[in-house]
């Protein structure tokens, strides 16, 4: 075994590192800067078209790997791939009426009505409206 005297010590001396207060100030500054930069980037995104910064379909400049644009592949990708890209791009722009949960009830949708006589049918009684005696926990446990 080689003696540890030959190896340089991997311990950081106390004098080498800055005082804690300074390092914390640096950390906080860095966090603030990063937050500001993120907010600026969010504002710069085109809100309607591009949902996230990670999704490059709608960015104006095209990268080297892209099929067209300034540094793209010389031969445009044709046929099915192009159709697929268009389709994926269109999925980002699905209007809100196809997501009824996200927005309020829109005029195009009618209220769902049960057939005649269904309202009186005890099967369709809401459980909240009935008296709570039949939903007793102890009875339920005994029944099980």
UniProtKB/Swiss-Prot annotation:
UniProt keyword Transmembrane present: no
Some GO term, biological process aspect, for this entry: which one?
Answer: mRNA transport
Motif Nuclear export signal located where?
Answer: 106-115
Compositionally biased region (Basic and acidic residues): 32-43
In its keyword annotation, does this UniProt entry include RNA-binding?
yes
- Segments carrying the region annotation (Disordered) are 1-77
As one GO molecular function, the record gives: RNA binding
This protein's GO cellular component annotations are: host cell cytoplasm; host cell nucleolus
UniProt subcellular location: Host nucleus, Host nucleolus; Host cytoplasm
Regions of compositional bias (Polar residues) in chain numbering: 1-15, 44-64
What are the protein's UniProt keywords? Answer: Host cytoplasm, Host nucleus, mRNA transport, RNA-binding, Transport
Write down the superkingdom of origin. Answer: Viruses
Residue numbers of motif Nuclear localization signal and RNA-binding (RRE)?
75-92
Which residues form each disulfide bond in the chain? none
Q: What is known of its domains?
A: The RNA-binding motif binds to the RRE present in incompletely spliced viral pre-mRNAs. This region also contains the NLS which mediates nuclear localization. These overlapping functions prevent Rev bound to RRE from undesirable return to the nucleus. When Rev binds the RRE, the NLS becomes masked while the NES remains accessible.
Q: What does this protein do?
A: Escorts unspliced or incompletely spliced viral pre-mRNAs (late transcripts) out of the nucleus of infected cells. These pre-mRNAs carry a recognition sequence called Rev responsive element (RRE) located in the env gene, that is not present in fully spliced viral mRNAs (early transcripts). This function is essential since most viral proteins are translated from unspliced or partially spliced pre-mRNAs which cannot exit the nucleus by the pathway used by fully processed cellular mRNAs.
Subunit note: Homomultimer; when bound to the RRE. Multimeric assembly is essential for activity.
Q: This chain belongs to which protein, by name?
A: Protein Rev
The scientific name of the source species is: Ovine maedi visna related virus (strain South Africa) (SA-OMVV)
State the gene name recorded for this protein.
Answer: rev
